[in-house]
Amino acid sequence: MQNLMAGKILLVTGGTQGLGLAIAEAAAREGATGIAIVGRSAEKAERAAAAIRDRAIGGGPEGAARAESGVEVLAIAADLAAPGEAERTVTETLERFGRVDSLVNAAGATSRGTLLDTTRELLDEHLAVNLVAPFMTMQAAVLDMRRRGAPGTILNIISMAMHGGQPYLAPYTASKAGLAGLTRNAAFAHRFDRVRINGLNIGWTATPGETVTQRTFHGADADWLARAEAAQPMGKLGQPDEIADAVVFLLSERSGVVTGSIIDWDQNVPGAYDQ
């Protein structure tokens, strides 16, 4: 533990499972004072909040001290596809903690659809969750940071699919490419407010949600993960804990002046070919 988030207040959308939960847990271990996590299910959000509190203790004397001081975790149930819900998550965080130091947009819609078979409803869902919701949480968080005259950090979970993606990811790719553009636009607009905004293009990652996706859309069996990892250059898929450490670093002062960066977090290189 390096206390990279010491005393900070963090809001994580999609923070009740998978990568979002790993990010919240990493922030707790790194000394965050308050963490708000957002998910669609109130019950699941409360369970995740309890897990974050339990796991924040870590190991050794530092972990024991952290357990005694505690980390306050606010569970927020919200449907980010609905108008006004994204802004409400920031409002509730401000009501509980008084400020937002850092924001992570990790919630995402991942249903499949090609250019030809995607319905307007499916496209609207992807744009609402993957682009509009981050836009509105960023707006509300930056307004708070400017009001206080305080620096802040924002990290958007984007996707390697923003480079083009598979044909069946048309609405997902469109929404994530939009989020990448928004990330750079907002970073430039608010650099003199000392609000640093960056993004991670996440590649194929081993999460419970990915297992559901593989079974739902691709008919995967129980051995899908082992086969998938065996075919990867590094012999494994991306790991939530590893990505979470990178997110916490980018949110912290240790990442210095970096802003407007979209970092590919993957083991393949876009635009590079064997032959």
Residue ranges and their predicted role:
Residues M1, G164, V248, T259-Q275:
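Short C-terminal tail/terminal secondary-structure segment
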Residues T16-Q17:
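Conserved glycine-rich cofactor-binding loop
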Residues V104, R191, R196, V258-G260:
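Short, small/polar-rich loop/turn modules that mediate ligand/substrate recognition or access, typified
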Residues T114-L115, L122-L127, A228:
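Substrate-binding pocket helix/loop in short-chain dehydrogenase/reductase
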Residues M138, S175, T183:
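Active-site helix of classical SDR
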Residues L143, F188-F192, G256:
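Alpha-helical segment proximal to the catalytic Tyr-Lys
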Residues S159:
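Residue(s) in the substrate-gating loop at a strand-loop-helix junction
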